[in-house]
Amino acid sequence: MAMIKNIFLVTLLFSFGIELYAERPASDQADEDKFGNKHDWCAEVNYDHTLIIVDTTEKFNENQYELLQNQILNNSSIAKLPPYDRISILDLTGRNITATQTKPVFSKCRPRSGEKSSQYKLDQPSFWNPKEKMQQAYNFFNQDLAKARTHFDELGELSGEFSMIMELIKEISRVDGLNFTDGSGYKNRKLIIFSDLIQNSENLSIFTSCKKGKCITWDSVKDAPKIKALMPAFKSDNKPEVLVYYLQCKYNKNLNNGMRDFWTGYFTDAGMKVTFDTETACLESKKNT
């Protein structure tokens, strides 16, 4: 059952790239960017962009950490994206840094892999596009991705004072440098949030109510001016779709405190389609013996 769950999760995380993928022409700009330091291995055309927010304000238990590393940020999961799609990873730390100051841990386009067995024709080598050249760029890409995973390895017991989830979503909707705004030119955008969803900032905190077993409702706060000011700036008809991988075990083990209803209300009012997935099982962290 765990394997079935993992396959489902990977499919859910990166499915739009497969479903909406149409055969793309080869890009000299991307293919000649050997180290990815000129154009991030991106083509002249902006295709799709998947942005992952990893909320590390509450330290992970071992099971959550393994899920992040082995199912979401691993090489094979990212390989599900079509060539030339951009993948970005943001760390929401809450540690002496505001949402505005948050920069990507990783943001590159997925180069062609050189794999004959790939479902994407662009990945498959040819006389004009030899396997060795493709795999060289792809290996450099995976090395950069490994550095991003190492970033989360090094967090240890750190936890943050604030959890500015809404603030960060607002920032990615309006900051051009994150390549996720309506004006970024990407045909499709997907936002993945890996979090316990405990919004906790000066603008809005749901920590106390949710911890007591019943979260405040979205309707009770949404009309406040400072909450309206936090709403995402996405205005186009083709807004990003959202997948929330909800780490419910610590504060909402039975999924009955209204947390998902709160965030469903938020995303609905933002005009964004949201899907939730949850932890498979709430297990205690392993202790050293």
Regions found by a protein language model. Give the residues of each.
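Sec-dependent N-terminal signal peptides
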Residues: 4-15
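Extracytoplasmic/secreted cell-surface and envelope-processing proteins
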Residues: 60-64, 96-101, 199-204, 252-257, ...
